[in-house]
Curated annotation (Swiss-Prot):
Pfam families: Papilloma_E5 (PF03025)
Protein name as catalogued: Probable protein E5A
Family: Belongs to the papillomaviridae E5A protein family.
Keywords: Early protein
Organism listed in the record: Human papillomavirus type 6c
Amino acid sequence: MEVVPVQIAAATTTTLILPVVIAFAVCILSIVLIILISDFLVYTSVLVLTLLLYLLLWLLLTTPLQFFLLTLCVCYFPAFYIHIYIVQTQQ
């Protein structure tokens, strides 16, 4: 009988933490860009491109359910709230 060493703990932890780190980095970057950019069309373009890049990276790193839940919580809800705030302040 052979004993095969398995190092699953480090790989699993890295796999679980990396999407969350990417999510928060992109979310903070998007918020900073939104605050610095006052033109609505430029803001929308930057936000959409950032979110698409973020979604592609996250889709490669997570399971479908984790991808869906984390994307809703970290990405779409803050972006939607900021979008509504900007629309209300421009009127």
